[in-house]
Amino acid sequence: MQNFLYLLIFVIFSFSLQAQEKPRYIFPVKPDSGKIVLSGNLGEIRPNHFHCGLDIVEKEGEPIFAIYKGFVSRIKVSSYGYGNVVYITHPETDHVSVYAHLSDFSPKLRRYITAKQYEQESFEVEIFPSPDELPIETKELIGFMGNTGNSFGSHLHFEIRTIADFVLNPQDFFKIQTDNLPPKLFQVAVTPLSPESRVEGKYQSFRSNVFGTPKGWRVAKPISAYGLVGLEGITWDVAEGTRSSFATSKARLRVDGKEIFSFHITNFPIYEVYALNLHINYKLSRQTGSNFQRFYQTEGNRLGIYKGNGKIMVEDGKEYQIELDLEDTHGNFRTLELTLQGKKPKETQTNDLISSGILSYDIDENTLIIKARYIPPKTGNIEIVLENNQSLTVPMAYTEKQQAVFLYDLRKGKPKIIRTKNIELPFRKKMIPSGRNFLYEDYFMKVFFQNGALADTAYLDFSSKTTHFTIGKIAEPLVWDAEITYNHKANTILDLKKAFLRHERGKEFFKELNDSTFSVKTAYLPGDFRITRDEIPPFVRLVRKTPEKLVFQIGDDNSGISHFKAYLNGKFLLMEYEHKNALLWTDPRTTEPLTGDFELQVFDKMGNMQVYKTIL
């Protein structure tokens, strides 16, 4: 009986170990030998999103292999985004591997894809094969390294996700390169997190350089603070043998030796990738052009990579020793040391309103920052009248550059009027609550924010004209799109059947258009949206013509290229497109001779068509 129990324990323990073992994946590039060079890794800060995988650098045409057996579950061919991309589902491990920017696919996949392209009469296709259509073995060729889509150099963008589309760190599965270099830290900031908070006497982020120490870095002198504050920093990782920079994957924050916060950038949902703008101090990053990562949690951040909230409560007269570990995926780390000294701000005592020449305000999350260019004497209060006509007196917080600064917590009530002794300023912003669906509506437009679109309460301006409208200003970015429905009945200037919205960050196209309204979904907030009409067709220019190949340059300066179709003797002819150089060419794998009547139709996103015809 005793031997049986020992055997049972051994079997259970063995199964437990096997369950904890990482899958034996092969590397997708040069799996048997060869030096691997990375130019990017998981968690790098990119515009508005985290980078979700590895960028592996090699010459164009390098074979790409499946890391494990499974089946092709998704294929997309596009000139944008991931370009030519293959998704392989691995049922045994509940993972999905992703291979993007391929120059071409393996012969097996190419035959399948080309058949679908001719079936749909389209270069761009997105296909979801059933599990039995395209089975894949470990180390099977699936394609070749390339530069398709939004790529600016030959490389493979490689990801590992869970079946539920959570992004994993591929470097946890492979020993890719030797690296003994720790992350770098370039600057730190301490930021006030409540209207009562101060850093170096002010309600604004205080930035400081760091100097090197045997442990890592140190801030030269103590930073005075009071109230709830957060630590931020500019950091990235480096590696031996490459000039590329990488993500600092882990951070741990301690106050007086006690850990209060950490993050590990892995295992986050792909659909929350844009929460990157909550991981960084979005406002400070826009002001400085540098990405200050937050070492504390913020409202609405659903990435799930954090432990603890990291916010530090600083009391008057107390001193706090702060340590921050920054670590890369290879376990190399260094530690920042700094001291916070608690210093309560002085209070101004007066019953009088301040006299001011100029009165203005800004909003930082839920804090209203009011600045009054004072007329001596510089002491005094301001009055805030709320929407319910309640009157509040707000004392001066501090002065800077001939201005008195006042701070008000907007969670106490929405202002209607801000008043000094000689100026009255209306508060015109609309409050958009987070955590629930909300609809803003005026004569010209409706703006719908779904639950989760905003990380925190927002205060926005809305302005509408017949040919444009403005939504601004927002301190934190949208996490998800907002839906705008615009009443265009008063617009007698433009025919909207061939119109779109132009924004400084991009273009938005009508999701719905009827006799009275149009609607769009957008993440381009804040900003000015202008209704723009496009009746000009794309241009088409023949670049090269041989018996084996046709090459065209195509383009559209307004709404942009939508799609194209080519026909040879009345039959669909597959062509390939690369938007980066605006070139369109006949499929190099076509075996039929290019002779007879040729017609190329190129459409823009407003439906304008340009036709090129010739006899080959």
Task: Label the predicted regions.
Residues 4-13:
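Sec-dependent N-terminal signal peptides
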Residues 137, 178, 193-196, 201-345, ...:
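Long, low-complexity serine/threonine/glycine- and acidic-rich segments characteristic of extracellular
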Residues 225-230, 362-369, 477-483, 544-551:
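Short coil/turn motif common to extracellular beta-sandwich-like domains
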Residues 232-236, 368-375, 485-489, 549-557:
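Short edge beta-strand/loop segments characteristic of extracellular beta-sandwich folds
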